[in-house]
């Protein structure tokens, strides 16, 4: 069985790591290269760097920051934000990214995901899904939750069902899915386990849970109840509540296979 992964996430805005609540109410959390270096030293399995306003501002992710980070960090680095064309992916990989996350562009041009995965290999293509719970639906007399995809850093609704979308992205060639619950983001109430279960039961690619971690138990729940392959967190690490080592030790104590 593959070891589960802990992935600290750096949301970057104007060259600084920030953390918000439900995609707003932003707080500064430091210089991205310094923050990444700290997590590298703590034993993070991977690091994710998301330029959270790149798509909305229609500008490219800062390659210079990625280059500096890649020189400092010796674990796989996933970079996303403003990725709209094949050249963007090539430039990020050349700058030192190991994987590239596609979000809004996948919604507008789904075939872009297939093209990217054919050109670079699906192991380095991550599709990021920002999902928000909307009105429940009735299926065969049972009330079921429904989640909708949002784009542009969670600013624009699409009307697309998130669970069906996750399946489509896996079929098109995504090597991994990064699923963020917008309802949970920054709330510290735990992952949306129902959303994670719905997606992990339908796809055969690794799923990363994101949005809502407030304690170490939430990380373990993502794996044990949500069925995910990796857990992503930000504020519990950024503001010193826990270290990555503490998180790994806790998860291992719950019987989860970890790289210690």
UniProtKB/Swiss-Prot annotation:
It comes from the Bacteria. It is found in: Cytoplasm. One of its GO terms (biological process) is L-histidine biosynthetic process. This is Imidazole glycerol phosphate synthase subunit HisF. HAMAP family: HisF. Heterodimer of HisH and HisF. It is an enzyme of class 4 (lyase). Belongs to the HisA/HisF family. NCBIfam families: hisF (TIGR00735). InterPro entries: Aldolase_TIM, His_biosynth, HisF, IGPS_HisA/HisF, RibuloseP-bd_barrel. It catalyses: 5-[(5-phospho-1-deoxy-D-ribulos-1-ylimino)methylamino]-1-(5-phospho-beta-D-ribosyl)imidazole-4-carboxamide + L-glutamine = D-erythro-1-(imidazol-4-yl)glycerol 3-phosphate + 5-amino-1-(5-phospho-beta-D-ribosyl)imidazole-4-carboxamide + L-glutamate + H(+). GO terms for molecular function: imidazoleglycerol-phosphate synthase activity; lyase activity. Its EC number is 4.3.2.10. It holds the Pfam family His_biosynth. Pathway: Amino-acid biosynthesis; L-histidine biosynthesis; L-histidine from 5-phospho-alpha-D-ribose 1-diphosphate: step 5/9. Keywords: Amino-acid biosynthesis, Cytoplasm, Histidine biosynthesis, Lyase. One of its GO terms (cellular component) is cytoplasm. It comes from Psychrobacter cryohalolentis (strain ATCC BAA-1226 / DSM 17306 / VKM B-2378 / K5). Gene3D superfamilies: Aldolase class I. The active site is at 11, 130. IGPS catalyzes the conversion of PRFAR and glutamine to IGP, AICAR and glutamate. The HisF subunit catalyzes the cyclization activity that produces IGP and AICAR from PRFAR using the ammonia provided by the HisH subunit. The keyword Amino-acid biosynthesis applies.
């Amino acid at each position: 069985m593959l070891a589960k992964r802990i992935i600290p996430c750096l949301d970057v805005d104007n060259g600084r790591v920030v953390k918000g609540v439900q995609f707003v109410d932003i707080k500064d959390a430091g210089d991205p290269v310094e923050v990444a270096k700290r997590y590298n030293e703590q034993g993070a399995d991977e690091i994710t760097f998301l330029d959270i306003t790149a798509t909305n501002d229609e500008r490219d992710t800062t390659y210079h920051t990625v280059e500096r980070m890649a020189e400092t960090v010796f674990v796989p680095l996933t970079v996303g934000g403003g990725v709209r064309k094949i050249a963007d992916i090539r430039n990020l990989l050349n700058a030192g990214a190991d994987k590239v996350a596609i979000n809004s562009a996948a919604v507008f041009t789904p075939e872009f995901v297939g093209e990217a995965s054919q050109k670079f290999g699906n192991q380095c293509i991550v599709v990021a899904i920002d999902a928000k719970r909307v009105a429940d639906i009735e299926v065969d007399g049972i009330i079921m939750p429904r989640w909708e995809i949002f784009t542009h850093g969670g600013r624009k609704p699409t009307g697309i069902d998130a669970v069906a979308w996750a399946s489509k992205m896996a079929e098109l060639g995504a090597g991994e899915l990064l699923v963020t619950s917008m309802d949970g983001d920054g709330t510290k109430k735990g992952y949306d386990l129902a959303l994670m279960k719905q997606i992990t039961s339908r796809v055969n690619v690794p799923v990363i849970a994101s949005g809502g971690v407030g304690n170490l138990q939430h990380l373990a729940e993502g794996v044990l109840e949500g069925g995910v392959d990796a857990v992503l967190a930000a504020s519990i690490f950024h503001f010193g509540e826990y270290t990555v080592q503490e998180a790994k030790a806790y998860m291992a104590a719950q019987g989860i296979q970890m790289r210690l």
